[in-house]
C-alpha cells in the first residue's frame, strides 16, 4: 500500500492511485515539497513531514523559536471550497494564503482543517506557515521531560470540494463519526454521523448512502436517505442501524476491521465519499480482576512510546511507523501508551490493524501553577476536543488521558508560579466532564506520580488512575520491592488502578561483570542493573492481577536536552570511556533511538509476551571481556521448555524449566573461562539457538 490519505475519503482507493487524481468529485493532493527558513533570508528545500529540531534535538540546547515554511499550489476552480488539512504543526502555527492570515492554531500534535476559500485565486497560490516552538504559558505542554520540537512534522493536504460535501470541520480527519452505543456478542448498534454542506446558491436534494463493508470487501449493510438542503446551508446527518452476528474486534487475537462508508449523490452523480475503519468491541475495567475485552479477562501488558526517531525528531514517515509496529508485534505487547501527546493518525491505524489497545493523551504535563490563566485551561480543553474528534473512530483506543505527573517539577515562579493542587482537582473535574460529553463510552483518566499522597487526589474525578513508579531508580534506593508495596496502598485507595510508567536508564554499551557492582550508577546506567530492575518489577506485577494495564517506560530512547546521564561505556566492566552520543538522552528505552540495538530487556519481554516464536537470548552479550579466574554467571531469556548450554562445543548443563516465577529467566550454574576466547551456545528443545563469545580480560 503506497500511502493512506488520512483526510477525506476512500482510504483503499487513494492508496492505489495518484494523490492528485480526481477521486469521485473530490480532489486532493499531499503537499510534500516546501521551502524552509529560520530567518526568512536563507531558504532550503524540505520534504514534509519535517521538524527543524531533527538534528539539534539531541543536544544540550535545541532551537526554540519560529521558522517559516512556504509552498505553491494551483487552483483551477476558485469558486469551489478549498481546505488545507494539517495533521500536526508544532507547537503553534500561523497559516497565510496569498499573504492573508487564515488560521492561528495553538497545539502541536492534533490535526486541524483550514478553510482557505476566501483567500485563494485561480492559478498559482502561495501558502506560508509560521511554526513556533517557544514556550508559551498558555499552551500545553509548558514544561516536560521531552523536547518540544517545531515544524510541520505531520503531513499536509490541499483538498478541493464539490458544491456539496461532507464537512471536514465537524468530525475530524475522517469527516464522520461512527459510534457503537451497544455492542454485544449477538447484536451491535451503530450510529453514523456527519455534516453535509451545500455551498451552492440553490437548494438541492441529495442521497446519502451508508454502507458497512466486511474485511473481504463484501457488503454487510446498506441504506439510502434523501435529504433536502437549503442554499448555503448544512445538514447534520445521523443514521442508526442494528446488525446481528457481527465479527468482534478481539485484540491481538483477532483484530477484525469493518469499513463504514458514506457516499453523497446528486442524482446519479457522486459528489463526495468518506470512510473509516471500525472495530466492534466491548470492554470494562474491574478493580479486583483487571481488564476485560469482549467479556473475557484480557490483561493489558505493554510499553509506552514517543513519536520520535534519531535524525527525524517527531517527523516520522509511514514507513517509520510500519517498522516500529513490526517491532511492537515482535515484542508481543498487546497495549501501548502513546505518550505524552496525540501521535500521528497512521500510528493508530497500525494499532487498529494489529489489535493493540491504546491509551492516548493530551500534553498537559507537569505544570499547573497558581498563576495559570484561563487561556491555559481553554487550550487544554481545545486540545482534548481535537484529539477526541480526530481519533474517535479508532477501535484500538480505549483510554483518553487527561494529564501526566501534575505533582512534580516545572511549577515555579519563572513559569506559572507554585504548584496549585486545588486547581488540578477542580480543572480535572471540568476536563473529565468535557471529555465524557465528547465520548461517553471510553475511559478517561490520569497518570500520577505522587502515590495519591496529595490531599484531594483520591477524589479526582476519573474512571481510572495510573501511576508512574520508579522505586529503586529515582527513590527507594536499593529497594525495588517498594514498587508493589506502594501499588498495594494506591489500589486500596483508588480501586481501578494501572501502571503507566516503570523503568530504569539502560546504556547497552555499559557493563559490569561483578554481580556486587550491579547497582544504579548515574554516569553508567549499567545494562545489568536495567535487567535486574525489569525482572523485579515483572515478578511483582505477576502478583497484582488487578492491574488493568501496565506499560514499561519506554520502547525507544528519546532525547531530552536537560539530561546528562548514562554516557560512560565499557565492554569489560573495568575501564570506562565517555560517549558524548549517549548524553542528553532518556535511555530507559528497550531499544536505542536509532532502532539499531535491541537491549537485553527487549528480549525479556519478548520471551514473556510473544507466544508465536521461541526466544533464546544471552544477556550481557555486549560485555566482550571477562576475568579468567572469576565465576561467570551466564543468564538467558527464553520461553523454551528446556535449554542446553555448551562451552566451546561441549555440553555443560541442561535445564528443564527456568525454575523461577517469570518462567523466562534462566540462570546457569557458575563456570569459568577455559581459553583466551570461549564460545558459549545455548540450544532450546525446538532447536532455536543463541551464541556469544567472551575473551579473557587481561
Task: Locate each region found by the language model.
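Beta-strand-rich binding/interaction modules
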Residues: 187-227, 237, 632-654, 677-684
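Extended substrate-binding grooves/exosites of carbohydrate-active enzymes
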Residues: 51-59, 100, 134, 139, ...
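Surface beta-strand/loop "capping" patches
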Residues: 163-200, 606-640
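Aromatic sugar-binding surface patches on proteins
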Residues: 110-112, 232-243, 658-669
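Bacterial Sec-dependent N-terminal signal peptides
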Residues: 1-23
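An acidic-aromatic loop/edge-strand motif
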Residues: 25-33, 40, 46, 50-59, ...
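Extended acidic/polar, glycine-enriched regions
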Residues: 120-124, 193-286
Amino acid at each position: 500500500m503506497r500511502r493512506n490519505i488520512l483526510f477525506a475519503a476512500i482510504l483503499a482507493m487513494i492508496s492505489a492511485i495518484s494523490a492528485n487524481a480526481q477521486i469521485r468529485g473530490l480532489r486532493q493532493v499531499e503537499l510534500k515539497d516546501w521551502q524552509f527558513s529560520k530567518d526568512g533570508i536563507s531558504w532550503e528545500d524540505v520534504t514534509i513531514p519535517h521538524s527543524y529540531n531533527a538534528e539539534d534535538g539531541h543536544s544540550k540546547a535545541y532551537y526554540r523559536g519560529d521558522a517559516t515554511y512556504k509552498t505553491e499550489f494551483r487552483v483551477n476552480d476558485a469558486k469551489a471550497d478549498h481546505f488545507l488539512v494539517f495533521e500536526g504543526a508544532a507547537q503553534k502555527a500561523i497559516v497565510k494564503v496569498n499573504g492573508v492570515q487564515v488560521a492561528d492554531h495553538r497545539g502541536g500534535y492534533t490535526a486541524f482543517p483550514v478553510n482557505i476559500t476566501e483567500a485563494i485565486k485561480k492559478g498559482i497560490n502561495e501558502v506560508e506557515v509560521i511554526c513556533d516552538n517557544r514556550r508559551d504559558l498558555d499552551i500545553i505542554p509548558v514544561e516536560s521531560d521531552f523536547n518540544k520540537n517545531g515544524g510541520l512534522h505531520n503531513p499536509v493536504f490541499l483538498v478541493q470540494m464539490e458544491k456539496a460535501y461532507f464537512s471536514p470541520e465537524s468530525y475530524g480527519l475522517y469527516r464522520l463519526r461512527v459510534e457503537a452505543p451497544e455492542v454485544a456478542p449477538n447484536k451491535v448498534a451503530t450510529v453514523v454521523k456527519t455534516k453535509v454542506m451545500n455551498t451552492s446558491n440553490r437548494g438541492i436534494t441529495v442521497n446519502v448512502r451508508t454502507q458497512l463493508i466486511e474485511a473481504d470487501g463484501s457488503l454487510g449493510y446498506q441504506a439510502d436517505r434523501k435529504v433536502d438542503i437549503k442554499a448555503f446551508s448544512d445538514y447534520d446527518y445521523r443514521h442508526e442501524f442494528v446488525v446481528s452476528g457481527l465479527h468482534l474486534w478481539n485484540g491481538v487475537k483477532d483484530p477484525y476491521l469493518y469499513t463504514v462508508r458514506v457516499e453523497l449523490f446528486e442524482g446519479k452523480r457522486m459528489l463526495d465519499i468518506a470512510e473509516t475503519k471500525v472495530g466492534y468491541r466491548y470492554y470494562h475495567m474491574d478493580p479486583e480482576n483487571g481488564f476485560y475485552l469482549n467479556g473475557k479477562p484480557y490483561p493489558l501488558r505493554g510499553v509506552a512510546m514517543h513519536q520520535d526517531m534519531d535524525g527525524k525528531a517527531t517527523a516520522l514517515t509511514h514507513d517509520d511507523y510500519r517498522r516500529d509496529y513490526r517491532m511492537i508485534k515482535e515484542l508481543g505487547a498487546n497495549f501501548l501508551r502513546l505518550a505524552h501527546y496525540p501521535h500521528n493518525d497512521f500510528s493508530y491505524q497500525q494499532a487498529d490493524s494489529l489489535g493493540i489497545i491504546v491509551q492516548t493523551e493530551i500534553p498537559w504535563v507537569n505544570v499547573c501553577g497558581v498563576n495559570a490563566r484561563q487561556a491555559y485551561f481553554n487550550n487544554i480543553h481545545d486540545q482534548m476536543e481535537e484529539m477526541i474528534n480526530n481519533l474517535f473512530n479508532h477501535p484500538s483506543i480505549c483510554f483518553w488521558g487527561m494529564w501526566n505527573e501534575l505533582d512534580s517539577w516545572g511549577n515555579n515562579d519563572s513559569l506559572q508560579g507554585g504548584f496549585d493542587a486545588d486547581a488540578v482537582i477542580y480543572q480535572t473535574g471540568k476536563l473529565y466532564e468535557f471529555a465524557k460529553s465528547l465520548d461517553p463510552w471510553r475511559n478517561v483518566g490520569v497518570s500520577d506520580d505522587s502515590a495519591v499522597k496529595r490531599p484531594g487526589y483520591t477524589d479526582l474525578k476519573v474512571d481510572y488512575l495510573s501511576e508512574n513508579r520508579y522505586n529503586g531508580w529515582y527513590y527507594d534506593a536499593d529497594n525495588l520491592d517498594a514498587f508493589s508495596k506502594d501499588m498495594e496502598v494506591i489500589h486500596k485507595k483508588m480501586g481501578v488502578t494501572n501502571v503507566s510508567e516503570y523503568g530504569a536508564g539502560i546504556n547497552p554499551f555499559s557493563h559490569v561483570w561483578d554481580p556486587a557492582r550491579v547497582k544504579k550508577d548515574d554516569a553508567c546506567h549499567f545494562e545489568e542493573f536495567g535487567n535486574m530492575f525489569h525482572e523485579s518489577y515483572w515478578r511483582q506485577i505477576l502478583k497484582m492481577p488487578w492491574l488493568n494495564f501496565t506499560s514499561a517506560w519506554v520502547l525507544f530512547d528519546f532525547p531530552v536536552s536537560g539530561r546528562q546521564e548514562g554516557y560512560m561505556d565499557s565492554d569489560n566492566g573495568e575501564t570506562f570511556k565517555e560517549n558524548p552520543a549517549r548524553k542528553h538522552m532518556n535511555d530507559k528505552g528497550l531499544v536505542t533511538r536509532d532502532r539499531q540495538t535491541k537491549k537485553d530487556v527487549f528480549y525479556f519481554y519478548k520471551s514473556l509476551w510473544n507466544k508465536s516464536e521461541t526466544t533464546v537470548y544471552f544477556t550481557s552479550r555486549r560485555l566482550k571481556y571477562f576475568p579468567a579466574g572469576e565465576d561467570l554467571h551466564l543468564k538467558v531469556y527464553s520461553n523454551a521448555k528446556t535449554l542446553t548450554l555448551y562451552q566451546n562445543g561441549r555440553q555443560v548443563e541442561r535445564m528443564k524449566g527456568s525454575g523461577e516465577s517469570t518462567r523466562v529467566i534462566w540462570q546457569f550454574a557458575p563456570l569459568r573461562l577455559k581459553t583466551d576466547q570461549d564460545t558459549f551456545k545455548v540450544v532450546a528443545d525446538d532447536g532455536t539457538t543463541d551464541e556469544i563469545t567472551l575473551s579473557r580480560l587481561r
